């Protein structure tokens, strides 16, 4: 009987000692994300040290902006969504280059902006849905855009693609399937896909640039779940 009581006491004692260790597990918010390009959890993430090569700034001379609203994760209440890219403040018709070599997936050089009433109609739909539908985002709000597949050449962990949006024009003859080299001019910055584009004026020109990482678990965007105080510095490390 005494041995049984000692056994039960021992189990309870050890269990009581072990239990507090679970509270020491770090939450996603507590993990130091310095140098991470995105962080989903302790298995799905990408650190700058895991890149095989660095990228070029897509709008040469225009650095990663300081203003947090121009970086990933910023709210986009006008379309019931959030920002998944970096807005480089390049002026109208400024040359835009491929940040890395790859194969063109999309090049919609003949895309034309809808009129402002139709534009607002799509924004109203987004509001009613409570998010930005993929079709409205990709085929209306990105405007003229080029998408480049980089395969696993940027990192072995994820397939990577870059997206260059709101272009005023796309390099003549550039079509899906073309191979582009790092630094090739793929178009000129503009405001297509924006309200200014719908109004057919020259205001608000910039390059909206996105970088996505794909694997079997899903798609993740540059800056995803990175705190705002680390975001700019982490993204800057991506470029030469």
Predicted regions and their residues:
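Histidine-centered active-site/metal-ligand motif
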Residues: 83, 150, 166, 206-208
């Amino acid at each position: 009987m005494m041995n049984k009581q000692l056994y039960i006491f021992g189990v309870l004692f050890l269990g009581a000692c072990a239990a507090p260790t679970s509270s020491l597990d770090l939450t996603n918010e507590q993990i130091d994300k310095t140098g991470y390009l995105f962080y989903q959890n302790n298995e799905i993430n990408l650190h700058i040290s895991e890149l095989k090569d660095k990228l070029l700034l897509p709008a040469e001379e225009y650095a990663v902006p300081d203003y947090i609203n121009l970086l990933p994760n910023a709210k986009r209440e006008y379309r019931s969504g959030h920002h998944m890219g970096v807005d480089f403040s390049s002026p109208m018709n400024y040359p835009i280059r491929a940040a890395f070599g790859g194969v063109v997936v999309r090049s919609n050089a003949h895309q034309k902006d809808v009129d402002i009433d139709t534009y607002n109609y799509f924004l109203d739909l987004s509001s009613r849905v409570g998010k930005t539908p993929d079709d409205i985002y990709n085929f209306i709000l990105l405007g003229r855009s080029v998408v480049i597949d980089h395969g696993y050449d940027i990192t072995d962990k994820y397939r990577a693609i870059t997206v260059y949006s709101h272009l005023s024009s796309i390099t003549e003859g550039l079509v899906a399937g073309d191979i582009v080299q790092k630094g090739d001019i793929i178009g000129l910055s503009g405001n297509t896909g924006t309200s200014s584009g719908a109004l057919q004026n020259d205001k608000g020109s910039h390059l909206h640039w996105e970088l996505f990482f794909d694997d079997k678990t899903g798609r993740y965007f540059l800056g995803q779940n990175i705190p705002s105080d680390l975001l700019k510095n982490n993204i800057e490390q991506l470029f030469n």
